Amino acid sequence: MIAHRAPSPIDKLAVAVVHEPARAANAYAPLPAGAREEALRFLLQTAADAGVTLVATRPDGDGERRLGQAWPFPSPFQVTVRTVSIAEGVDRVEARARRSLERLGLPRGDALLVERADDLAGAEGRALWDRLEALKARGLYRRIGFRACVEDGPALLARRFQPDVVELPINLLDQRIQHTGVLAELAALGVAVHATSVFADGLLFISGEPLPPEMAGHAHALSRIRRRLAEARIDPMQATLAYVMGLPEVSAVIASVASAAELRAVVAAANAQTPALDWAALQLEPATAAAAGSSLQGRGRISSAA
């Protein structure tokens, strides 16, 4: 008889590797090439050892090639790949999606995601989607979908294109995707949801440092939320992971990490006991979240915390 293990929070955890961490210029000295490659191999091995099975990638820079040279063997990972902009033409989008797999050293990918919802809403949206469907039919990608935010109307796009996966920014500070019913609508359509920007660009971790200019007016609200977490003796990383991982409609929670140390911190927080908190009381007001815009829908890195 095969023993079935209990579900673990790590089952939902996915990683996106930050190859060039965005930090203060004087706070970080870039590693030499050989050390950088070894650090990446160590990060991926740490992810594999922790039970992470999904890696989210992006086509810009040299990140795909670096990953392709650093996978552990045998590799336990599936990958999601993003398209380049449709401004380059649908032929270029298709060719680059194929090239991404070559650079990653993989015969196929788990999911191919349209980078911007605007690409689907435009005049060539249907032609673009047809190319993705053709790549899926040829077995190069198991699933196809798109990335969007709440302002893009992701449920409406999902009804039109019937994706397998939608990637959305969801975090403790900005809970609009949940409370506007988008998650429920996508679940009813049978669409898998991948959550990104789960750490809201590290805003909950900033203490004693200036906030980004666009968030300076929300300092009091952020301070109030941090104070409530401190009074409950809950680490901000633990709280935001628990919130997103606790959403039943979310099948993957993508954390952007720049090192094995950051990943270990994420894994420890994900495995911590789920706190009993009033999640809705820990969000920014919806109008505030909407005004904050990209600050809450950034890359979800934890550089400010690690």
Say what each PLM segment does.
Residues 9, 36, 117-296, 300-306:
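Beta/alpha (TIM)-barrel catalytic core signal, keyed to glycine-rich beta->alpha loops juxtaposed to Asp/Glu
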Residues 5-9, 67-78, 98-107, 157-161, ...:
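Acidic (Asp/Glu)-rich catalytic clusters
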